[in-house]
Regions:
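Register position in tetratricopeptide repeats
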Residues: 42-43, 76-77, 118, 125, ...
Length: 237
């Protein structure tokens, strides 16, 4: 009985080796290394993620997804480096490479927009250079618009556009972008929080005479009617 159990255990172990070993083996093609890079990046292992993407490029130097992966991982890792701006500039260069190979990827355009935002914020917050910051912020918006032109129903692109618009003081347009996200994906992460904030800021940026135009018109009409009634009554007496 014990011998049978031992044999069954060996067979089960052999089956596990056959089934599971490919999952633990190094990828053998560029697509596999890109997938590995994505998993490592999502797990926060940026150094290993970058190495995986570089391995993909060794196998396929014109792999647009690998270049976009490098752009993404460098953008995420910039705050942990000794020269954040240089790291973000390298991310932007990798984005250039990716889009030169495949300009029809909405994911790559969204990634580019996020890189441009981080560079702009660095110029604004660290270097106190609002003019250069605004240049990058506007380029960021262009990138998100490119993503939307390729995929009009991409909720992530619309969300980032809404965030970008509010960041440059165009919250009324930002509200419209967030409402588009709401129509596409009501459960999009942090949507309601950002929509509420955008609506609040849009109320501040809208002049009161526009914000309350309806009420003002009704008040003017009421006053006009009262004045007409007053003069009509006065003439009788």
């Amino acid at each position: 009985m014990r011998s049978q159990s031992f044999v069954l255990s060996l067979l089960l172990f052999a089956v596990c080796l056959v089934v599971l070993s490919p999952a633990f083996a190094d990828p053998t093609d560029a697509a596999g290394w890109v997938a590995a890079g994505q998993s490592l990046t999502a797990a926060g292992n940026y150094s290993a993620g970058e190495l995986a993407y570089k391995q993909a490029l060794i196998l396929d130097p014109k792999n647009a997804d690998a270049w976009n992966g490098i752009a993404d991982v460098l953008n995420r890792a910039h705050k942990y480096t000794s020269d954040p701006l240089a790291t973000m500039q390298m991310a932007l260069e990798a984005s250039n490479q990716s889009l030169a190979l495949n300009a029809s990827s909405p994911i790559a355009w969204i990634n580019r927009g996020q890189i441009l935002y981080n560079i702009g914020y660095y110029y604004q917050d660290q270097l106190k250079d609002p003019a250069t910051a605004n240049m990058y912020y506007n380029e960021q918006l262009d990138a998100f618009n490119q993503a939307i032109s390729i995929d009009p129903n991409n909720a992530e692109a619309w969300f980032n556009k809404g965030y970008a618009l509010c960041g440059i003081g165009r919250c009324t347009e930002g509200v419209a972008a967030f409402k588009k996200v709401e129509a596409l994906d009501p459960s999009y992460p942090y949507l309601q929080l950002n929509l509420a904030q955008a609506e609040k800021l849009a109320g501040v940026e809208t002049p009161f005479y526009i914000q309350y135009a309806g009420e003002i018109v009704m008040a003017v009409i009421a006053i006009a009617i009262a004045v007409i009634w007053y003069w009509a009554v006065r003439r009788k007496y």
